[in-house]
Regions:
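Short aromatic-glycine-enriched beta-strand elements
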Residues: 16-21
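A short acidic/basic microdomain associated with nuclease active sites
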Residues: 89, 93-107
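Structural detector for short beta-strands of small beta-barrel domains
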Residues: 3-13
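Short, charged beta-turn/beta-strand-edge "cap" motif at the junction between a beta-strand
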Residues: 13, 53-58
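Short nucleic-acid-contacting surface segments enriched for D/E, G, S/T with interspersed K/R
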Residues: 37-50
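Short alpha-helix capping/helix-loop boundary micro-motifs
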Residues: 29-39
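OB-fold/S1-family single-stranded nucleic acid-binding modules
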Residues: 56-73
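Conserved catalytic cores of phosphodiester-cleaving nucleases, focusing on short active-site segments
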Residues: 9, 112-142, 155
Length: 155
């Protein structure tokens, strides 16, 4: 997976889940944030971020916020990147020989990111990206949501 037209910037503020203010080449730009999670541990005023310049002249914003520098690590903020990277990895043989690779597959009442056959068995794969980091440990999700909380059968 590769990003083109990347430029560094300084994160200033995030007024809502969808946009951020970033200083790029001496100008304050409103950029689209490709991750609606809170990301408070990463998007700290003054941190270095990496933005991708859009090639679409009719867009409201010229840039997408793609990644945040934290220490010596670059943390991807693009919520679509994990599935794209996993799909490329599977298609290139990362899991060995598989067939019938499909994305966004419904099975019963659930939807899975990928389905494929491995050694004649149907497999399902759910991919998660992590933006919550604490002392080198990544976690998912970065905040609780109603879809992540379910009653325990032992209660």
């Amino acid at each position: 997976m590769r990003y083109d037209n990347m430029t560094p910037g300084i994160f200033l503020a995030r007024p809502n889940r969808f946009i951020a203010h970033v200083e790029i080449e001496g100008q304050t730009e409103i950029v689209h944030v490709k991750n609606t999670g809170r990301c408070r541990e990463l998007l700290v005023p003054g941190c270095t971020v990496w933005c991708q310049r859009s090639t679409n002249p009719s867009r409201k914003t010229k840039f997408d916020l793609i990644a945040v520098q934290k220490g010596d690590r670059l943390i991807n903020m693009d919520s679509q990147a994990p599935n794209q990277a996993a799909g490329e990895w599977l298609a290139s043989g990362g899991l060995g020989e598989i067939t019938e690779l499909r994305a966004e597959v419904k099975h019963g009442d659930s939807r899975y990111d990928f389905s494929f056959l491995k050694d004649g068995k149907r497999c399902f794969l759910e991919v998660k990206g992590c933006t919550l980091e604490d002392d080198g440990v990544c976690a998912f999700p970065d905040e609780l949501s109603n879809t992540m909380v379910s009653p325990s059968p032992t209660r």
